[in-house]
């Protein structure tokens, strides 16, 4: 999972202006980096130009996804990531960056702004912080912990059963479980197995 670009743009009536951007092109060859960076800037501007105000969307280009958020006030953000990176985290990042940008940079400067004139330097740190979505996004972290717990729980159940022993056999031999509990287990087992691939 990787983020390659984070950009803030202004969608004017006739033209889209790049206000500020940050890039991580370290995974590309040295000689390709400047061309790739230019292409990302061009793609970001093109996507914002063709998006409506007040919209969020994702555009797939080969193994990359471009996530765009254009606010009603014409401020826009674009994240370019690989297709494994969670879109929800990208849109959370865009919302956070655009909100912070709009409070730190005066709205009057947006239409005429450029990367050289806009004083906002947080994009590089956001791009680096959000490289790992689990660290940056609390929901992703919780989801990863839940997945880990499920795996541990599954492994623990398998290790509790002796070699060749099945949970079905233990349930049927159990003296602790009542007939109703055994029937419930068998019904649940049948319902869960009906959808499995045989």
UniProtKB/Swiss-Prot annotation:
Membrane topology per record: Lipid-anchor
Alphabetically ordered keywords of this record: Coiled coil, Cytoplasm, Cytoplasmic vesicle, ER-Golgi transport, Golgi apparatus, Lipoprotein, Membrane, Methylation, Palmitate, Prenylation, Protein transport, Transferase, Transport
Record note on modification: Palmitoylated; catalyzes its own palmitoylation. Palmitoylation is required for Golgi targeting.
Top enzyme class: transferase
A Pfam short name: Longin
Residues lipid-modified (S-palmitoyl cysteine): 194
GO CC annotation terms, alphabetical: cytoplasmic vesicle membrane; cytosol; Golgi membrane
Gene3D superfamilies cross-referenced by the UniProt entry: 1.20.5.110, Longin domain
Record-annotated v-SNARE coiled-coil homology domain positions: 138-198
BP term (GO), one: protein transport
PROSITE patterns attached to this UniProt entry: LONGIN, V_SNARE
Propeptide residue intervals: 196-198
Entry's EC annotation: 2.3.1.-
Longin domain boundaries: 8-127
Covalent lipid sites (S-farnesyl cysteine): 195
Stated family: Belongs to the synaptobrevin family.
Physiological role: Vesicular soluble NSF attachment protein receptor (v-SNARE) mediating vesicle docking and fusion to a specific acceptor cellular compartment. Functions in endoplasmic reticulum to Golgi transport; as part of a SNARE complex composed of GOSR1, GOSR2 and STX5. Functions in early/recycling endosome to TGN transport; as part of a SNARE complex composed of BET1L, GOSR1 and STX5. Has a S-palmitoyl transferase activity.
UniProt-recorded name of the protein: Synaptobrevin homolog YKT6
């Amino acid at each position: 999972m990787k983020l390659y670009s984070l950009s803030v743009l202004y969608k004017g009536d006739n033209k889209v202006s790049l206000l500020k951007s940050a890039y991580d092109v370290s995974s590309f060859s040295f000689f390709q980096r400047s061309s790739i960076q230019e292409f990302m800037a061009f793609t970001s501007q093109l996507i914002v130009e063709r998006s409506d105000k007040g919209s969020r969307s994702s555009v797939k280009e080969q193994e990359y996804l471009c996530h765009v958020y254009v606010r009603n006030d014409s401020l826009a953000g674009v994240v370019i990531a690989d297709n494994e990176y969670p879109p929800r985290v990208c849109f959370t990042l865009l919302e956070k960056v655009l909100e912070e940008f709009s409070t730190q940079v005066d709205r009057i400067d947006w239409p005429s702004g450029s990367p050289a004139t806009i004083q906002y330097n947080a994009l590089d740190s956001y791009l680096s912080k959000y490289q790992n979505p689990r660290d940056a996004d609390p929901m992703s972290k919780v989801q990863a912990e839940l997945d880990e717990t499920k795996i541990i729980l599954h492994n623990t159940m398998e290790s509790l059963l002796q070699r060749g022993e099945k949970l079905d056999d233990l349930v049927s031999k159990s003296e602790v479980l009542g007939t109703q509990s055994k029937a419930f287990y068998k019904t649940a087992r049948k319902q869960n197995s009906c959808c499995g691939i045989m």
